[in-house]
């Protein structure tokens, strides 16, 4: 390898690390959008059942990068209005696409619920002084508090999040029997908590002094 190539490679690596430290969440968000676009492309061009597994894999990586995105934002303290809004749009778009292509009858009502709750959470995050999870932990019922306890690092939250991915994945892969229905309770939990979150934050916003 020539010296010129080494210098060029070092500069590209330096730029990448600078960008990662400067805008980590934005870079991860861009990768997530690329994965979603690839999944949509494979879905509409798929000619065999095996390619459906690639769609699930690409969207699964998208979900995992969402966890990395949150970690990087907390780790480097890079939170901004743009970053919050971008993360919200990527999350909701990914969920909507995956649930719609799953063919499940519950896809449309669940996505409408998610978008409504997401918009309220986004507005609350951008405008309110306290974090929206603090409201839920302070005023929510026992189930809501348990779901959001320990920053959602608990069994209930894991069940809801995993089921939210596994149920549409199972349906999309044309699985049946227990491999499909085992995830229904987790999705029901996810939907109930989302509904309660929507109602509670909407009421909190209405009764806030700024309103």
Report each predicted region and the residues it spans.
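A feature for the membrane-embedded catalytic helix bundles of lipid/isoprenoid biosynthetic enzymes
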Residues: 1-29, 88-211
């Amino acid at each position: 390898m020539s010296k010129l190539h080494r210098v060029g490679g070092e500069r590209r690596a330096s730029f990448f690390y600078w960008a990662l430290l400067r805008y980590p969440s934005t870079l991860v968000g861009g990768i997530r959008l690329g994965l979603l676009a690839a999944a949509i492309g494979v879905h509409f061009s798929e000619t065999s059942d095996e390619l459906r597994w690639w769609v699930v894999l690409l969207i699964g990586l998208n979900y995992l990068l969402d966890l990395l995105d949150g970690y990087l934002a907390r780790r480097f303290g890079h939170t901004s209005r743009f970053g919050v809004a971008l993360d919200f749009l990527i999350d909701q778009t990914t969920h909507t696409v995956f649930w719609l292509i799953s063919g499940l009858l519950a896809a449309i009502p669940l996505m409408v619920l998610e978008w409504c709750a997401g918009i309220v959470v986004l507005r609350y995050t951008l405008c309110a002084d306290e974090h929206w999870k603090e409201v839920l932990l302070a005023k929510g019922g026992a189930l809501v508090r348990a779901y959001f306890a320990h920053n959602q690092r608990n069994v209930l939250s894991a069940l809801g999040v995993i089921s939210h991915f596994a149920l549409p994945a199972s349906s999309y892969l044309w699985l049946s029997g227990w491999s499909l229905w085992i995830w229904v309770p987790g999705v029901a939990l996810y939907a109930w908590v989302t509904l309660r979150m929507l109602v509670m934050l909407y009421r909190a916003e209405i009764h806030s002094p700024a309103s």
